[in-house]
Amino acid sequence: MKAAEIRNYSDEELKKLLLEKKKQLMDMRFQHAMGQLRNTAQIKEVRRDIARIRTILRERELGIRR
């Protein structure tokens, strides 16, 4: 998910998306530990999506526009 796509969401939608991504990351970590996750690069992608969402929420909180 690109930052430009994320910026189109409202704050409430971003908070919901953040919770979904955190749950997805937790599930992926369990799958990885059990040896069921084939594409481990997905964990990295989800972590980065979470970081992007949190960054955009923080920018909005501080009133920073990009």
Curated annotation (Swiss-Prot):
It comes from the Bacteria. One of its GO terms (cellular component) is cytosolic large ribosomal subunit. Gene3D superfamilies: 1.10.287.310. It holds the Pfam family Ribosomal_L29. CDD domains: Ribosomal_L29_HIP. One of its GO terms (biological process) is translation. Transmembrane segments: none annotated. Keywords: Ribonucleoprotein, Ribosomal protein. Signal peptide: none annotated. GO terms for molecular function: structural constituent of ribosome. Belongs to the universal ribosomal protein uL29 family. This is Large ribosomal subunit protein uL29. It comes from Pseudothermotoga lettingae (strain ATCC BAA-301 / DSM 14385 / NBRC 107922 / TMO) (Thermotoga lettingae).
